[in-house]
């Protein structure tokens, strides 16, 4: 099992403890995880993601047996198709996109083009609902939470597999029950922001949408890695044997983009 939602790097406007890849490697070993898809946190606020992607690949180079890059591809930026091709050829675990930070509405044609391209290649597209609770956000972090409309629109783009991180129960249900069965199968969620006891939102979702719709994500170093483990450990006994999906199985490269 891998952590699909880890980061290196710090906020561009706030100190963040332990943003280094060597620390992440030790944390994964402690948690018994095989590896991680790793994003470069500052890239969400970069107008041009190329510098952040370069920093990400350089930082992860000594740890590529454990850490796979999750670079950003911005589809309204010149040459994004070439960027997608290059980062896939370099072994990226998934592609990250931040439509809320880029001011893209749910039915943005360029965002859909990125989803279609990821589906054709066979690389998952990762969307982040939030980095922090609204009450904790820095005044310079003005992007709102990802909406269910964004996820539904992208889930209908060809064969793309979506990984949505940071969602709560409300957004997940609003999205899931508005999709066809085939679309539901191509959307996976982490549960780092889904409540366990006493609300038992995760147990409810395991029973209704299915454990196989979930992947493991910690959001390190933004959140403690123990949160996700505790969510699973606190499930009712009859649900603990229901297996979640290993995010690695979602990456099935069909062809190299041209």
PLM feature spans:
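Active-site gating/metal-coordination segments in enzymes
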Residues: 34, 47-133
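Divalent metal-dependent hydrolysis catalytic cores, especially in the metallo-beta-lactamase
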Residues: 6-7, 11, 22-45, 67-72, ...
């Amino acid at each position: 099992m891998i952590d699909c939602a880890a980061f290196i790097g710090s906020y561009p406007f706030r100190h963040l403890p332990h943003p280094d890849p060597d620390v992440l490697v030790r944390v994964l070993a402690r948690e018994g995880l095989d590896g991680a898809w790793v994003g470069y946190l500052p890239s969400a606020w970069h107008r041009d993601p190329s510098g952040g992607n370069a920093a990400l690949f350089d930082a992860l180079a000594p740890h590529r047996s454990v850490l796979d890059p999750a670079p950003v591809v911005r589809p309204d930026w010149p040459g994004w198709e070439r960027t997608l091709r290059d980062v896939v050829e370099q072994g990226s675990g998934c592609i990250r996109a931040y439509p809320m930070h880029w001011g893209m509405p749910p039915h943005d044609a360029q965002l859909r083009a990125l989803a279609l391209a990821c589906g054709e290649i066979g690389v998952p597209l990762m969307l982040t609902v939030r980095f922090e609770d609204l009450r904790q956000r820095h005044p310079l972090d003005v992007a709102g939470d990802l909406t269910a409309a964004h996820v539904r629109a992208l889930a209908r783009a060809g064969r793309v597999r979506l990984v949505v991180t940071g969602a709560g129960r409300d957004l997940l249900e609003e999205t899931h029950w508005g999709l066809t069965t085939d679309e539901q199968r191509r959307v996976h969620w982490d549960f780092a922001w889904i409540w366990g006891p006493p609300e038992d939102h995760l147990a409810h979702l395991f029973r209704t949408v299915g454990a196989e719709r979930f992947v493991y994500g910690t959001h390190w170093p933004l959140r403690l890695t123990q949160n996700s483990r505790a969510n699973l450990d606190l499930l009712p006994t009859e649900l603990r044997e229901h297996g979640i999906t290993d995010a690695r199985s979602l990456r099935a490269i069909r062809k190299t983009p041209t």
